C-alpha cells in the first residue's frame, strides 16, 4: 500500500503545478553515507526540515508596486489530517515567511489551491 502522505503530495504537486505562474518540485531530502569516505551526506533544500514541495508563484506587481512580475519562493509542507510538523519543519516555514516567501502546512489539495491562488500580501 502506498504512503498516504506521498499520494497526497503527488496530487497537490500536480494540482498547483497546473496553475498559471505556479511551479512546484518535490524536495527529496535525507542523508546517506558516502561510499568513498563513509561520511554522512545530507541532501535536499534546507535539510533537515525543508518542506516537501518547493517552487515559486509568479506575482504581478501592481503599478503602485513598480509594475514588475516577481517569483515568490514557495514551500509547502505536506501532512495528512493527523500528521505533525517537526520543530525543524516549523522553523523552516517561519524562516520562509519572515523572508517574504510563501510557506504553509498543507493537508488537502483544497488547502494548496487556496495558498496558490489567494492574493499575495507579503511585500
Regions found by a protein language model. Give the residues of each.
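Catalytic phosphate/metal-binding cores of nucleic-acid and nucleotide-processing enzymes, i.e., regions
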Residues: 1-123
Amino acid at each position: 500500500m502506498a504512503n498516504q502522505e506521498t499520494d497526497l503530495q503527488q496530487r497537490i504537486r500536480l494540482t498547483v503545478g497546473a496553475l498559471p505562474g505556479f511551479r512546484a518540485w518535490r524536495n527529496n531530502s535525507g542523508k546517506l553515507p558516502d561510499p568513498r569516505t563513509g561520511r554522512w551526506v545530507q541532501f535536499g533544500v534546507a535539510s533537515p526540515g525543508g518542506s516537501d514541495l518547493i517552487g515559486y508563484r509568479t506575482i504581478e506587481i501592481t503599478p503602485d508596486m513598480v509594475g514588475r512580475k516577481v517569483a515568490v519562493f514557495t514551500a509547502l509542507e505536506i501532512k495528512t489530517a493527523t500528521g505533525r510538523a517537526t520543530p525543524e519543519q516549523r522553523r523552516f516555514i517561519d524562516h520562509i515567511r519572515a523572508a517574504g516567501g510563501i510557506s504553509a502546512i498543507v493537508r488537502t489539495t483544497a488547502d494548496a489551491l487556496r495558498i496558490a491562488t489567494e492574493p499575495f500580501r507579503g511585500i
